[in-house]
Amino acid sequence: MKNLGGLFKILLLFFCLFLSTHIISVSCLNSDGLTLLSLLKHLDRVPPQVTSTWKINASEATPCNWFGITCDDSKNVASLNFTRSRVSGQLGPEIGELKSLQILDLSTNNFSGTIPSTLGNCTKLATLDLSENGFSDKIPDTLDSLKRLEVLYLYINFLTGELPESLFRIPKLQVLYLDYNNLTGPIPQSIGDAKELVELSMYANQFSGNIPESIGNSSSLQILYLHRNKLVGSLPESLNLLGNLTTLFVGNNSLQGPVRFGSPNCKNLLTLDLSYNEFEGGVPPALGNCSSLDALVIVSGNLSGTIPSSLGMLKNLTILNLSENRLSGSIPAELGNCSSLNLLKLNDNQLVGGIPSALGKLRKLESLELFENRFSGEIPIEIWKSQSLTQLLVYQNNLTGELPVEMTEMKKLKIATLFNNSFYGAIPPGLGVNSSLEEVDFIGNKLTGEIPPNLCHGRKLRILNLGSNLLHGTIPASIGHCKTIRRFILRENNLSGLLPEFSQDHSLSFLDFNSNNFEGPIPGSLGSCKNLSSINLSRNRFTGQIPPQLGNLQNLGYMNLSRNLLEGSLPAQLSNCVSLERFDVGFNSLNGSVPSNFSNWKGLTTLVLSENRFSGGIPQFLPELKKLSTLQIARNAFGGEIPSSIGLIEDLIYDLDLSGNGLTGEIPAKLGDLIKLTRLNISNNNLTGSLSVLKGLTSLLHVDVSNNQFTGPIPDNLEGQLLSEPSSFSGNPNLCIPHSFSASNNSRSALKYCKDQSKSRKSGLSTWQIVLIAVLSSLLVLVVVLALVFICLRRRKGRPEKDAYVFTQEEGPSLLLNKVLAATDNLNEKYTIGRGAHGIVYRASLGSGKVYAVKRLVFASHIRANQSMMREIDTIGKVRHRNLIKLEGFWLRKDDGLMLYRYMPKGSLYDVLHGVSPKENVLDWSARYNVALGVAHGLAYLHYDCHPPIVHRDIKPENILMDSDLEPHIGDFGLARLLDDSTVSTATVTGTTGYIAPENAFKTVRGRESDVYSYGVVLLELVTRKRAVDKSFPESTDIVSWVRSALSSSNNNVEDMVTTIVDPILVDELLDSSLREQVMQVTELALSCTQQDPAMRPTMRDAVKLLEDVKHLARSCSSDSVR
């Protein structure tokens, strides 16, 4: 028993030894390992390598073999690297317990949350990379404890707040990347303390304020990225102290002032990008000192002056991009000494003179981009002989001369865009034989001869634009077989013959051959060009039928085959063109009925079938075309009645033309539902009944019902139409004019007044009833007369004399009134300087340089209304704004009043634009833009800063007065409200023809939107210098419809627009692309202001903002690249 007890003790001892050994092996994982396991708890997702290695192992006392871990000699964690490991979760505060950590790389994962402040405890950290994650909130200010930190990457996160000042006091910091966050506030002054900093990237944040001058103390800086922030102020001169600087990007900020950069200290500078700022002055000549400079990029920096010749000293320069500035003068020939130059971009400036032949010496030059300047003369032959050029972009200049045969030897040439110049002569026949051309754009020159056959010899041609020249002959078959062409424009030439067959699987997407002499059938092979989105073959001599193969073009959005000699019926297969938005086959000889399956065109906005031989009644499916806004099917043989379902096309806004179709019956009642319709033509039919249905068409600007069999009175809402276009109602012998219409209507119309039925009816009253009525009427009149006499006697004592002006405290003194009356000889006719809707204007010169304009208002109201007017005028007199005419004084009497204004020496905007000698006051675009902005400011003030708001109701050039500096001042504001005391709307129209908003055409609805419409018309006058209703316009066309029509016919092409609608005086000025872009933006604003629907118009505050933005136009482009 005793032995058994001893054996048990021995076994128990062994068990205890085994158990203790096991426990020791579990707890022997060192503290760094345990810290890592704690960090693991904060992670939502880790790669398999982590789950398989990050765990307790009896045979390992350290985590040195774990995935992503590297240890130092003491078996402490020195590096944690999870880069690109698809880890998600948060970085726990336990990270601060890794005291030996030297490298922490968690880049390119999905970490979120804040950066733990405990990182400041990792005092041995040399590299901290948390880039490309989702960290948010502020950068902890404890990082300044990392005295050994050399590299800090925090870019591409969601960090916010200001930078800690202490960040730049980390003594050994060499690399700091903070780009692509949402950091705000100023750049700390402490940046100058970062003596060891070599690379600093802070771009694509929200930093504001000035770049600190102290940055010049960061003497080790080589790379500095500050672009795409909100920095202001000037470029600090202290940057010139950074002798080690190789790369400087400060583009896409709002920096101002002169560029003072380029000291002898910049020898190491390789790349300089100052683009998209608002600098003053020119390109600093001192940049010629930066002898190592490889890329100089200052795009849209608001630079002016000339290009310094000192840039020719930069022998290593490969990229020179000074585009989109206001540089003037000529290109210095010294640039020909930049022997390494690869890219020269000087486009979108105001450069003049010839292109220097010295540029032909640049043997490495690949891209020469001089477009949108004012260059003249010929392109030097040395450039045509270049064997390095791949791109030659010189469009929109005044260049001339022939295209030399040497052009055909440019073996690397890919892109040649010469459009909108004055090149003449033939295109060299061999062009394309020796090079792989990709883009050839010669539109808008004076080129003659035939299309060269080898343009697509290299089978890479994507764009071939030869429109608006004098070319003749046929299209070479090789061009039709060129599958790579995407955009093909030959419009407005003298080309003839048949169109070539197009290859299968052609890349063609845009085809415009309009206005030539092409003949024969339209090739069915066009239907194989599946990418086609636009076809314009109008104004040619094509014959035969429309090929049904065109129905294969499911991406086609625009088809114009108008004004040809096409015949036959419309192929039903076209219904498969389900993307079609505009379809025009007008002015052909097509016949038959319109296929019902065209109802598939759900996106169609414009349908033009006019001047053909279509029959079978107006198509019943039209209401299914919900987006249809223009329907022109005039002068066909549709016959039948107008289907009532047309009234269901709610978006029918612009035009409904059913004229000349032999239509019968009455106008269907549903047509009255087209309340947005602006143009209606149902003339030359056999329609009967009354026009009462048209009462509801309140948006109509033009209507023609002539040559039908209508009867009865013309609706009240068409009174204005009858006055302006009486012929639109002629040929209806039984139509008549209501007695409520103005007498002037009858003077211009052959129609008679409607019979007054009340006069022809017998009263049916007996003799004694008539006597009784007469007696009672006499008694009533007597009572009224006695009452009026009594009232007059009561008021006589306190009433002013009839011709005496009434004064209040706020009104001008009687002495000034006497001077005004004396200066105008009691308002003598000879002092008249204008007549307006509200009265006559006189010029009163009171000596000592004081000249006033005196407006005499005539009232029809009684004296109480005048007292109300005094309060109203008093309110107007307190309105103060630089773009509003200031009321200097006013006087009232019973029947009229005088209002005194400062005299404007330049007269009105109408005088300046349309006066007898407008050339004496020609406004350049800058002046016109300032007028547009000034008027917008004035109207915005009236609409939103006056209480109550003032709606002008008669904005037009005559009411915009110009001071000696051509600053605009709006006049007559408040007078419409002063002279009309109704509350909501009136039956009479307030405003001037051409400026009246559609909703105000036949009654006045008070709203700011009507002023916005009138303002839009004024903008169009500034752009076009045409009157609102100009004699040059087609009949029944105002400036709004004329501009919309012009833009529509040009497919919104910028060049076409400039030549079509813009004032010819501005054309030379608009060679500057930024100004041309301004004109486009202002035109778009005008069209937005003149939309039919008042709710769709911008407010005047919107207009001011857009115009302010236009002032600083800058094309969007990434400044991350120097190109």
From Swiss-Prot:
Q: What is its EC number?
A: 2.7.11.1
Q: Give the Gene3D superfamilies listed for this entry.
A: Phosphorylase Kinase, domain 1, Ribonuclease Inhibitor, Transferase(Phosphotransferase) domain 1
User: Which InterPro entries would you find in this protein's record?
Assistant: Kinase-like_dom_sf, Leu-rich_rpt, Leu-rich_rpt_typical-subtyp, LRR_dom_sf, LRR_N_plant-typ, Plant_RL_S/T_kinase, Prot_kinase_dom, Protein_kinase_ATP_BS
Which segments carry the LRR repeats?
31-53, 74-98, 99-122, 124-145, 146-170, 171-194, 196-218, 219-243, 245-266, 267-290, 292-314, 315-338, 340-362, 363-386, 388-410, 412-434, 435-458, 459-482, 484-505, 506-529, 530-553, 554-577, 579-600, 601-625, 626-650, 652-674, 675-696, 697-721
| Catalyses which reaction(s) | L-seryl-[protein] + ATP = O-phospho-L-seryl-[protein] + ADP + H(+); L-threonyl-[protein] + ATP = O-phospho-L-threonyl-[protein] + ADP + H(+)
The residues forming the signal peptide are 1-28
**A single Gene Ontology CC term:** plasma membrane
Q: How is it modified after translation?
A: N-glycosylated.
Task: Please state what class of enzyme this protein is.
Answer: transferase
* One Gene Ontology term of the molecular function aspect: peptide receptor activity
What residues does ATP bind to? 833-841, 855
Q: Which residues are glycosylated?
A: 57, 81, 110, 121, 182, 217, 244, 252, 289, 302, 316, 321, 337, 398, 420, 434, 494, 531, 536, 560, 591, 597, 681, 686, 745
- Residues where Phosphothreonine occurs? 824
Q: Name one GO biological process term.
A: response to jasmonic acid
UniProt-annotated location(s): Cell membrane
Q: Which intervals lie on the Cytoplasmic side per UniProt?
A: 791-1123
User: Which PANTHER family does the entry link to?
Assistant: LEUCINE RICH REPEAT FAMILY PROTEIN, EXPRESSED, PROTEIN KINASE DOMAIN-CONTAINING PROTEIN
Family according to the record: Belongs to the protein kinase superfamily. Ser/Thr protein kinase family.
**Functional summary from the UniProt entry:** Acts as a receptor for PEP defense peptides. Unlike typical immune receptors, senses an endogenous elicitor that potentiates pathogen-associated molecular pattern (PAMP)-inducible plant responses. Involved in PAMP-triggered immunity (PTI) signaling. Interacts with and phosphorylates the kinase BIK1, a central rate-limiting kinase in PTI signaling.
How is this protein organized at the quaternary level? Interacts with PEP1 and BAK1. Interacts with BIK1 and PBL1.
Q: Which protein are we looking at?
A: Leucine-rich repeat receptor-like protein kinase PEPR1
